[in-house]
Amino acid sequence: MFEAIFPSTPQARLKRDPREKPGLSSFRSTFRQQSSLGLCIPRLMLPKEASPSQRHSSMSSSMARALVLLQSMASRDARCPEWKPHQKPRTLSKSVQTISRYYRKTSEPKDAASLTGFMSKMELRRVFPTHPDCPQFSTRATSMSHCGSPTEADLSGEIDNSSETWRGTQDLFLARRGSDTNVDGYLLPFSKSICEFDYLRKRRKSQTLSPVTSSSVASQSCLRKRMPWYLSVIHEKDHCLSELEIQVQKKDEEILLLQEEREALKMQLKCLLKGKGQETSMSPGRREQLSDASLKLGRLSLLKAFSRHEEELQHWWQMQEESAAPERGKEPDLGGGEEDEGLEGEPDGVEDTGAWGGVSQMGSVHEEGSEEEEEEEGDRDEDSEERELPEEEEIPRRRASSLAESFEEELLAQLEEYEQVILDFQFNLEATRTRYSLATGVIASLQQQVDFQETQLRKINTENETLQKELRERRQQLQAMTDKFSNLREDKKHQEMMGLIEKDNQLLRQQVSELERKLTKRDCVISELDTKVSQLQEQVELDQNHLQRWKQLQEDLQSKKEMIQQAEQHTRVALESSQSRLERLRNKIIQATFSISGTKSLANEISDNDILEALQRIISERSDYYNQLKQKGVKVPPLQQSEAFLTSKSKKGTSK
């Protein structure tokens, strides 16, 4: 029932008025307009199509009239009652009657009835934090101190907005300064929290001991207004909601940054796959050098960025756990609401700096890597020009292909790790949303308690007023009858008149009681119908909002699924092409080595070690044949130095 009246989701709460835009500003404006009236004054029955300025002007005019009437009634009750002839009572609106009853009750002296009312209020305030719908009530946001604190600009904006909304009602409340005094003659101060009662009592005692005679201090004390005790709590809950919304926006920005990094890595992978086809036309030495340099640079940049992100995530989780541990074990403290505000903004700042720092570090590493590539290319251009034989190109090609494959595997692993990080951030975002819904539930429970207290207060005030009116009317009638009967001389006429008057009184009492019963029944029926209509309207709005939200979520999930399928197809095509190229190269090497006469035809499957041994044997036989010819004195052109270097390098590799 109360979830329909006070919805916990932000979409349902923001769409309470169809003219308002869904956002934080509209929510705050409507919330402050309701709370500025003290939550004890019923809102005027205005149509929804009326603008906020018209509603505010109508509220202010009605409040001004009600306060003037209230002041006159309070001054009339303070004087001695004067007997006047019976007049027709003036009918007032329900809002004016409610305001007059509330302020008359607060301005009455401390008799037995007021003492019982005050004790009941204090008992209700003491028991309220233990209510099951209110989790460990305090004057600040419950278990939300680790979620972060707003910046100074946000705080200044909040102060400006609240001052503008309260400035209109401040002038109106100054008109009832005379009726806001208690028995001691002091103005009743703000009721901010339960923990401030002792301070206010001590301050009153100090004022009675050492009164201030200056007119400036007296004028400032007269400007203080009386407000309900729960307003400060509701304002702090609103402040906590604004902080949570700011944090949700920050998390969304971080998720966008991570998605952009993932797209950049995908683009790098595509560029590498495109550049792989161009590497076949390059010389073997230069291709090998470029592949080694690019592999080293890619590994460096990716490993550094990933390690930095891991450190930042671990640091952020540690800060979250450290800030959440003392909040869980702490007793409900109603007065300490401003202790942990300095530590709330640290995790978000660490995350922002970590994300931007990782991006800048990756950019700097790529710049340094490009400079090193240019220097190495200039140094090794001369060595690569000497390698011209086709047989020497096979080994660098094979190495370049293996390096490219390992680099592609590392890039794929990095992409999977970044997707895991994005999932973690989404989980944190859901946690903040659940905390946001908890805060809205606390506000709804507070509003429920306020409405319940107001209804009880209205019932008691209406009963008291009806009894007082009946008493006054009966006194006036008795006074008139005694005046008449004193003028009568005959006893019989006097007795007959008294009997008739008593019968009339009984009939009138019965009629009045019946009319009162009918009136109360009608009022109850009207109030129940109004509540049912409002509940049904809000339920319809909630259902519409939920439908729209589910549709939007379904569309987003469908688009994400299509993007993931496209990326998977691209990666599969690239992997199959690279495997086919590697298989063709291996087949060519096998054909070149085992097609020579004198080689053994292996019946089993040819392994990489067999191919390597065959190549080494061919090279060693060639060098032996060259040495034999040289020893016999046959003139043979000398072998090139690069060939001898390659044979020694291959022998070292086999020995290892």
From Swiss-Prot:
Residues 241-278 form a coiled coil. InterPro entries: CC-FHA_domain. Residues 336-351, 369-394 have a biased composition (Acidic residues). Keywords: Coiled coil. Residues 1-31, 139-163, 320-403 are annotated as: Disordered. The keyword Cytoplasm does not apply. Transmembrane segments: none annotated. The keyword Coiled coil applies. Residues 139-148 have a biased composition (Polar residues). This is Coiled-coil domain-containing protein 27.
